[in-house]
Amino acid sequence: MSTYLLIDTSTSRTSVAIVGDGKTLFASHHDGALSHGEALPELVAQGLKLESRIDQVIVGMGPGPFTGLRAGISFAQSFALGRGISWQGVCSLDAIASQISKSDFIVAVDARRKEVFYARYTDGSRIGEPKVCQPSQLAVFDIPIYGEVSNQYPDPTAFIAIAESGAIYSQPIYVRRPDAYPAPIGVKFRPMNQLDLVPIFSIERSAYGKEAWTMAQLKEESAGKDRM
């Protein structure tokens, strides 16, 4: 049987598992919405110490915030390419739904910007594609809601069964457009410096209110390797 490297970075949690011959050989995670890029290689390295033979990679394709999602997908694709093996993508919400035994329910995860990504499941099957809305709008369904809000995250060990069912994705499930857009013609760029943090903080607060990063978070992010 094949040995799988399973990765998910669609939520604030970075999750990695290695499953071989139907047994979970490694499973670990790291919590932190801003640390996917740093945590993922470390978790994979830990897993490879226990099982270095990987036949296939399966990665959660979202929906999820753009930056974290891309960290996992890019890593999975690069790892597979480097080893000359195949990779597949699955819906991360399906891996939360696999943990729920109810017959009719919603799975919702934080989409930031005061929104959630969600999907409805009936008798174990997802109804349509994932969507995005404000949390208060989910009340109209009048059915149980599970997911990140109740401390439930995608279980990567469920990815194998999901992929085998044929519910695979070759492109990220963004649901909404990324926050980044092509630059207007004629705009010039320069490296960011510490003096820019004050106006950046002001813009962040104006745009996102209570959801905005704190000055401490901005300083920590800007001080990271290759940030400026």
Which role fits each region the language model picked out?
Residues 40, 211-220:
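A short, aromatic/hydrophobic, helix- or strand-capping loop or linear motif
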Residues 188-200:
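A short beta-loop-alpha structural element at the N-terminal edge
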Residues 222-228:
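A short helix-loop-beta-strand connector motif used in the catalytic cores of GNAT acetyltransferases and
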Residues 56-87:
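DPxDG-like acidic metal-binding loop motif
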Residues 1-26, 31-39, 88-186:
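Oxyanion-binding and handling regions
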